Amino acid sequence: MYSVTINQRVEAIKNNEEEINLFVEEYKPFIAACTQKVVGRYVAYGQDDELSIALMAFVETIRSYDVSKGNFLSFSQNVIKRRIIDYYRKEKKHSVVVNINGHLEDEEEETDLGIAMSIDKYSEEEISEYRRLELEQLKKELKEWDISFFDLVNISPKHKRTKKIYSKIIKFVLSRPDIMEKIKQKKYLPVAEIEQSLKIPRKTIERARKYIITVVIIFTGDYEFIRDYVNWEVE
């Protein structure tokens, strides 16, 4: 009941700056705890850049939240982690530029290289973990459609022509808020409507149904790392 109350509260305040500020103040300990878990050390407001980034990420999650994203605190924790990792990546790139152009002493170069390698390894491990968590969440969401990962292996398009047809359907679905609402809220794909609009045979759409639904869910859900991994292109 507690988490549901938080979800409802965030939905209610997401467009109210004053209420957002109050909510952020209330959850500063939570934000700090999330940050410390990522960086592996104590952080303090006004001293650590990572905590400032976490604060901005938390506000971002409030403004973008809706119930389809699941539990708000879990959602915000994931976003905080991602923003901090993005920050580390940018810092790593900056340090490489300095090493190339700054003519640093050997000892300093070795230190910076060690930091860069450490950040890179940390980022890879974190991304792998986030992808695993996203796959678990996706598995649960697909189960509501009676879709398994095993199904996807069998129905994934193999030929260029088939990929093009599937891509056309997916692009059409994503461009139609009314169809997206039927998928998200009513849990069904309006095959007849797609058939009529695109003049694609009903059998083809039915055959592609599970694949289309899966790609649409990934594109519109909180699956940032799966999207990067799948690298699906809607032509």
From Swiss-Prot:
Activity regulation, free text: Negatively regulated by the anti-sigma-I factor RsgI7.
Molecular function as annotated in GO: DNA binding; sigma factor activity
Record motif Polymerase core binding, residues: 49-62
GO cellular component: cytoplasm
Start-end of DNA-binding region: 191-210
InterPro entries in alphabetical order: RNA_pol_sigma-70_dom, RNA_pol_sigma-I, RNA_pol_sigma70_r2, RNA_pol_sigma_r2
Induction of its expression: Up-regulated in pretreated yellow poplar (PYP)-grown cells.
Gene Ontology biological-process annotations: DNA-templated transcription initiation
Recorded superkingdom: Bacteria
Keyword list, A-Z: Cytoplasm, DNA-binding, Sigma factor, Transcription, Transcription regulation
Subcellular location: Cytoplasm
Pfam families: Sigma70_r2
Subunit field text: Interacts with RsgI7.
Entry similarity comment: Belongs to the sigma-70 factor family. SigI subfamily.
Described purpose of this protein according to its UniProt entry: Sigma factors are initiation factors that promote the attachment of RNA polymerase to specific initiation sites and are then released.
Name recorded for this polypeptide: RNA polymerase sigma factor SigI7
UniProt source species: Acetivibrio thermocellus (strain ATCC 27405 / DSM 1237 / JCM 9322 / NBRC 103400 / NCIMB 10682 / NRRL B-4536 / VPI 7372)
